[in-house]
């Protein structure tokens, strides 16, 4: 895939992020939130590159999925698009999702799990050179330049047996993460504030 926006996209509704979460929960309750009906995608052995927003993006409909053996690189390097979907892999509600054996490099961010990374496992991935381009200005509170970012969840999230070689290996604004048997060459950043969502000047509480 080579896309000016997103390589693979698993949802279709465009509203404010908080309202999309509410709508998705209501649709799930109405239609039956069952593993047999929701998610369970397999995304395997793709070469996804030079996308200007994200490589693989999922929201609610990506639950119970397996993302494995993909080569994802050169994502958002021109920084022509911004927003909350900027990463090689960006998932909202990565419930019981396995992200394994992917090679992710030269992205503004490597893997970003956002909202409800419950039962998520990130294992056996190789991540390196995931940072903002040299010409880009780092804005206060800017969420870029790391291999893995786990945000607003209570877990459990397991991150194991990965090779993390970027300047920042892990950024956390969450709870319930276990980091086990990783090779880590970069720094850790723990964020305790600044993750509230403001849409059209109004505070949309995440919790």
Placement of each model-derived feature along the sequence:
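Extracellular parallel beta-helix/beta-solenoid repeat domains
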Residues: 1-207
């Amino acid at each position: 895939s080579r896309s000016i926006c997103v390589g693979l996209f698993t949802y279709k509704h465009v509203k404010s992020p908080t309202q999309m979460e509410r709508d998705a929960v209501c649709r799930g309750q109405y239609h039956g939130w069952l593993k047999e009906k929701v998610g369970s995608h397999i995304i395997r052995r793709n070469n996804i590159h030079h996308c200007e927003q994200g490589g693989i993006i999922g929201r609610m409909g990506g639950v119970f999925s397996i993302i494995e053996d993909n080569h994802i690189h050169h994502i958002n390097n021109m920084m022509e698009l911004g927003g909350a979907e900027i990463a090689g892999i960006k998932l909202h509600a990565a419930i019981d999702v396995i992200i394994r054996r992917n090679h992710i490099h030269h992205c503004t961010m490597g893997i970003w799990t956002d909202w409800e990374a419950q039962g998520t496992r990130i294992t056996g991935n190789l991540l390196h050179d995931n940072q903002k381009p040299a010409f880009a200005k780092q804005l206060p509170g800017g969420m870029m330049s790391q291999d893995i970012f786990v945000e607003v969840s209570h877990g459990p999230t397991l991150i194991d047996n990965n090779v993390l070689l970027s300047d920042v290996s892990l950024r956390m604004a969450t709870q319930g993460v276990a980091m086990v048997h990783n090779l880590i060459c970069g720094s850790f950043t723990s964020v305790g504030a600044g993750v509230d969502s403001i849409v059209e000047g109004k505070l949309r509480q995440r919790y």
